[in-house]
A protein has these predicted regions:
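A short, sequence-level motif marking secondary-structure junctions
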Residues: 40-45, 141, 194-197, 222-225
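Acidic, contiguous internal or C-terminal segments within carbohydrate-active enzymes
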Residues: 110-177
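Beta-strand-rich recognition/accessory modules
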Residues: 206-259
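Ordered hydrophobic segments in well-structured contexts
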Residues: 25-27, 38, 121-123, 137, ...
Length: 259
């Protein structure tokens, strides 16, 4: 069972919280309706895998999505920090040197729920990969449907360059569709199939999973997402499908920083 710390939670900030040893529900108002998200902290037991972190989310009494599990992949390479005439390389060619890909695993430990001036944060300690460690945080905003999910991790590995791929895995896909707007501004919708994951060249770097109750869109924060670029080519910033990079089990969809 996870230890849930709610000392910094104030219901006067516009959020309601219900928690137990294994679950947590956060709810808030959006345009006169009540949005909710249910987290569950059920670890792996023997051959039984851990339960998806996000049990369900929706509005009022209608569940839009259920059984979602965040996944983070880190591409880890090496910076060239050798000084040349007193300067470090600015345009470092990291991809020309060996790099590896590692998966982050979340084993929920301390869960901290806090509020401040119209926003709430659920931070779950225990996100670790081979070289990174830290927590997974969800930030919610009063009267807004946006949920900001971020890995708050750091590394002691010296001279590290990294990229990340992040997504949501969903084991049960019956009745679900994949939606996006393609590079030519055409809306696209396809039922979820058993095809291997592939990269999508979308507009707005956004891709959605939808059903008859609603949709869930994955999109990066534009000014926190990419390293500085001198051009604006569409390298395919979204991905979806089964067994992504042979590192995420089943179906998942998300965003990526292209190597």
């Amino acid at each position: 069972a996870a230890n849930i710390d709610r000392q910094a939670f104030d219901p006067n900030d516009g959020f309601a919280l219900i928690s137990s040893e294994e679950e947590l529900r956060l709810s808030w108002e959006i345009a006169g309706r009540e949005a909710f998200i249910d987290f569950q902290f059920i670890p792996r037991q023997g051959n039984t895998p851990a339960a998806p972190l996000i049990k369900s989310l929706g509005i009022d009494s209608s569940t839009i999505m259920e059984g979602l599990d965040p996944n983070y992949l880190f591409w880890v390479g090496d910076r060239d920090l050798e000084l040349r005439d007193g300067w470090e390389i600015f345009f470092d060619r990291v991809p020309t040197r060996p790099y590896s890909v590692e998966k982050g695993y979340l084993v929920p430990g301390e869960v901290t729920v806090s509020t401040r001036e119209g926003r709430a944060t659920v931070e779950i300690d225990g996100l670790n990969s081979e070289n990174f460690s830290g927590s997974l945080a969800f930030i919610f905003y009063r009267d807004s449907p946006f949920i900001h999910m971020e890995a708050r991790v750091s590394t002691e590995r010296p001279a590290t360059a990294f990229l990340y791929h992040v997504g949501l895995a969903k084991p049960e896909t019956q009745g679900q569709n994949l939606e996006w707007i393609d590079a030519f501004d055409n809306p696209r919708i396809e039922p979820i199939s058993n095809s291997t994951a592939s990269v999508y060249q979308t507009r707005y770097r956004s891709i959605a999973l939808s059903n008859t109750n609603g949709s869930l869109v994955v999109s990066p924060f534009p000014h926190q997402y990419l390293y500085p670029l001198d051009f604006a080519d569409n390298f395919g910033y979204n991905w979806a499908g089964h067994e992504y990079l042979d590192m995420i089990d089943g179906f998942a969809f998300g965003v990526r920083q292209p190597p």
